[in-house]
Swiss-Prot record:
It comes from Salmonella enteritidis PT4 (strain P125109). GO terms for cellular component: plasma membrane. It comes from the Bacteria. Belongs to the GatZ/KbaZ family. GatZ subfamily. This is D-tagatose-1,6-bisphosphate aldolase subunit GatZ. Pathway: Carbohydrate metabolism; D-tagatose 6-phosphate degradation; D-glyceraldehyde 3-phosphate and glycerone phosphate from D-tagatose 6-phosphate: step 2/2. The keyword Repressor does not apply. The gene is gatZ. PANTHER family: D-TAGATOSE-1,6-BISPHOSPHATE ALDOLASE SUBUNIT GATZ, N-ACETYLGALACTOSAMINE PERMEASE II COMPONENT-RELATED. Keywords: Galactitol metabolism.
Length: 423
């Protein structure tokens, strides 16, 4: 990370896409995409996804590291080009507990991530706990972030400290996209970014963490990008010019969250304006979902009814029987909720792919289509971009390859934004 930031600060318009997903096909897509490019690949886990208690994936930080390393080994991707990051590390998971208890757990969370070899650490203590006022005083946020940083510094070996980097601050939207409809988004004011930096510097120095301040590479801000279930707010460079100008005077860059679904030109403009770390998550699993839905349509055309996977029906059954991951986010009317379940840009289907019934049905779908030849006309009908790539000779028409390539469509837009010489 330090090399990428140094090059950006030296005047190169380069950035890095942060892949925020625990889905094996998404991780495989990212590693295959940059297998021969020489680029570093940044893969991040969030605190609710992966923590010392297992998170919703059931993985602790060391488990997630081994999970990613296992995929890298299968792909042939060298570990030295992998950067592992932890996102929103702090009391996020324990906001309903008293602050002292939540912070004790947060310290252990940080230690577990650093001990497992994660080198990009987002110190985020911005959320109020059960006995806190709302919102938290910025100095309290900074002091808690400093305590988390201290835990990282005491855990890291000298070798790890060579690569260890920190991100401070938080964005306006909730982690994972907006829960309700959006009409506009508040762009972070430069004075608020400056205050974030100043309060963190003071809090770090109060704990003797002067050296650690040199490892702070980025501040999380809101440059004016967001999405909800049906809408996207696109980047408007003119609205963020003061914010962009301020960061030039520091040794840092910005990190932008919720950049999913922006245009490739927007990504290039964001990187130009020093939002050099671009987070993406739901857009990648949305592309995965599109690919599986497309393959299900092909299956309906090619496979006899009694042999089909019924993957779309299985998804509906599971999500309706177990609505915990979507009920409070989607519209209450039945017909509207079904549209959201299938097609919402926030893509809450992503929480259900590991479900045993859904996983088995996806495996059957892929097995069924592996046993037949996929007609080019059918691929053109349901995956037209992949049809073009087949015609160009850069893609072989297997179900697995079609899924991977569909996910990589998202990564192509980020590559355009993060790499100035890509046309």
């Amino acid at each position: 990370m330090k090399e990428i930031i140094s090059r950006h600060k030296a005047g190169e318009q380069i950035g890095i896409c942060s892949v925020c997903s625990a889905h094996p096909l998404v991780i495989e897509s990212a590693l295959r995409f940059d297998l021969n490019s020489g680029n570093k690949v940044l893969i991040e886990a969030t605190s609710n996804q992966v923590n010392q208690f297992g998170g919703y994936t059931g993985m602790k930080p060391a488990d997630f590291r081994d999970f990613v390393y296992g995929i890298a080994q299968e792909v042939g991707f060298p570990r030295e080009r992998l950067i592992l990051g932890g996102d929103h590390l702090g009391p996020n998971c324990w906001q309903n507990e008293p602050a002292d208890t939540a912070m004790e757990k947060s310290v252990e969370l940080i230690k577990a991530y650093v001990a497992a070899g994660f080198s990009k650490i987002h110190l985020d203590a911005s959320m109020s706990c059960a006995d806190d006022p709302t919102p938290l005083d910025p100095m309290v946020v900074a002091k808690r972030a400093a305590l988390l940083c201290q835990a990282a510094e005491t855990t890291a070996t000298d070798e790890q400290k060579r690569h260890l980097t920190y991100v401070i601050g938080t964005e306006v939207p909730v982690p994972g996209g907006e829960a309700s409809a959006i009409n506009a988004v508040h762009v972070t004011r430069e004075q608020d970014a400056a205050r974030t930096l100043q309060t963190h510097q003071a809090a770090f120095r109060a704990l003797g963490l002067d050296e650690a301040l040199n490892r702070v590479i980025a501040i999380v801000v809101q440059p004016g990008v967001e999405f909800d279930h049906t809408q996207i707010i696109h980047y408007q460079p003119q609205a963020a010019q003061a914010l962009s100008a301020w960061i030039k005077e520091t040794p840092m860059v910005y990190e932008a969250h919720s950049t999913d679904y922006q245009t490739r030109q927007a990504y290039r403009a964001l990187v130009r304006d020093h939002y050099a770390i671009l987070k993406v998550g739901p857009a990648l699993t949305f592309a995965l979902r599109e690919a599986i839905f497309a393959l299900a349509q092909m299956e309906n055309e090619l496979i006899s009814p009694e042999q089909r996977s019924r993957v779309l029906e299985v998804i509906d059954e599971v999500m309706l029987n177990e609505p915990g991951y979507w009920k409070k986010y989607y519209r209450p009317t039945w017909s509207q909720a079904m549209v959201d379940i299938h097609f919402s840009l926030s893509d809450r289907i992503r929480y259900y792919w590991p479900h045993p019934r859904i996983r088995q049905s996806v495996e059957k779908l892929i097995a069924n289509l592996n046993n037949v030849t996929l007609p080019l006309g059918l691929i053109s009908q349901f995956m037209p971009v992949q049809f073009e790539r087949l015609s160009e000779g850069v893609l072989t028409p297997t179900p697995h390859n079609l899924i991977i390539d569909k996910i990589q469509d998202v990564l192509r837009a980020y590559r355009f934004g993060c790499t100035p010489d890509v046309a």
